[in-house]
Amino acid sequence: MEIRGKLFVSQVVRKFNLNVVANSDYIDREISTTGITRVGFELAGEILFKEIWNIVYFGSKESNYFNKFSETIISKKLGKILDLNPPLIIFGKNFKHAGILLKLAERYKIPIVEVKYSFYELNFTINSYISQKLSHQSLVHGTLLSVFGIGVILMGESGVGKSELAIELVKKGHIFVGDDAILVNRIGGNLYGRAEDSTKDFIEIRGLGIMNFSRSFGIERMIESTKIEIVIELIKPAKHEKIKFERFGREIQHKEFLETKIAHYYIPVIEGRSISDIIETAITDYKLKTSGYNSAEEFILQINKKGI
C-alpha cells in the first residue's frame, strides 16, 4: 500500500530545535514540497507560480542583491515573496536585511526562523529530513533488522517465523528496527525503512503475544531506521518445490522491490536448520560479493583446474 507522507513546520522546528523569531503561533502550517528554495526569479519580478509550497531561504546572496536597492524597494520585493505564502521562511546569519523582513512578517501568518547554518548545511540536514518525510512511502508486511550493518527485511507468509527469527538474530548481537508494519521510503534510488508509528517498539511472538521490544531486550538493541539492501523471503516447506534455488550462487539474485532493484534471497524454512545462522551467512556472502570476492567463482575455478 503506497501512501504520501505529510510534514508540518512544527515537526521541522522540533527536530532541529530551530529559533522561531516571528509568528511562532503558526508553526502548524503544512510543508507540501521538498527542497529549500532561493527565490531569485521572484525577487527579480518573475512570478512563476501563485504560491510557494516549500521553505524559502534568505542568505548572503539575497543580501548582496538587496544592497542595490533602497529600503522601500527591498520591502516591496520581500512583500511579494510573503504574498506567495510559503509555509516557512528561514534566514541565515549573513542576511543583513532581517529587520525589514521581520517588520513585514507582522502582517502575515508565516513563521520566520533564524539559523546559523549556511544554505548548503541546510540542504544536508533539514532538506534531507524533509525529503524523507515527503517521499512516497509503502507499507510493507515484514520484519526489519540491521545484520552486520546491512539493512535486511524478512518477508514471507504469516506464521513462517519472521518475528521469532528476529529475536534469535537480536540475541546474536544484531539490531532490531521494526516488526509487522514497515514504512519504506524510496529516496534517490535507495530504500529506507522504519517501523510504522502504531507498531513502533513492539513485536508479536506467536504463543506469547505482543511484547515491548526495548523493555524486553534493551533500547541499545534498536535503531529508528535503516537503509534496506536485502530482501530475504522465508519459504514454508510446502512451497519449496515451486522455487528454483540457485545451487552455486555465482551471482547475487535481485528482484524489483517497490520499483527498486534490490538483492533477494529465498531461504527455505526446514525443521532442524538454524535459519539465523543461514541469514548471517547470506549477509556475509552478500558483503563479500559486493566487495569483489566470489566464493562460487573460486570453487568453480579450482574444479576446472583439477579437471573434475
UniProtKB/Swiss-Prot annotation:
Cofactor field: Mg(2+)
Annotated ATP binding sites: G156, E157, S158, G159, V160, G161, K162, S163
GO biological process, one term: regulation of carbohydrate metabolic process
Region Important for the catalytic mechanism of both phosphorylation and dephosphorylation, annotated ranges: 203-212
Keywords: ATP-binding, Carbohydrate metabolism, Kinase, Magnesium, Metal-binding, Multifunctional enzyme, Nucleotide-binding, Serine/threonine-protein kinase, Transferase
Binding locations of Mg(2+): S163, E204
Region entry Important for the catalytic mechanism of dephosphorylation, spans: 268-273
Active site: H141, K162, D180, R247
Recorded GO MF terms: ATP binding; magnesium ion binding; phosphorelay sensor kinase activity; protein serine/threonine kinase activity; protein serine/threonine/tyrosine kinase activity
Catalysed transformations (reactions): [HPr protein]-L-serine + ATP = [HPr protein]-O-phospho-L-serine + ADP + H(+); [HPr protein]-O-phospho-L-serine + phosphate + H(+) = [HPr protein]-L-serine + diphosphate
Uppermost EC category: transferase
The keyword Nucleotide-binding appears for this protein: yes
Enzyme Commission number, as recorded: 2.7.11.-, 2.7.4.-
Domain of life according to the entry: Bacteria
HAMAP family: HPr_kinase (MF_01249)
Function: Catalyzes the ATP- as well as the pyrophosphate-dependent phosphorylation of a specific serine residue in HPr, a phosphocarrier protein of the phosphoenolpyruvate-dependent sugar phosphotransferase system (PTS). HprK/P also catalyzes the pyrophosphate-producing, inorganic phosphate-dependent dephosphorylation (phosphorolysis) of seryl-phosphorylated HPr (P-Ser-HPr).
Entry's family note: Belongs to the HPrK/P family.
Note: Both phosphorylation and phosphorolysis are carried out by the same active site and suggest a common mechanism for both reactions.
Assembly notes: Homohexamer.
Notes on the domains: The Walker A ATP-binding motif also binds Pi and PPi.
Record's protein name: HPr kinase/phosphorylase
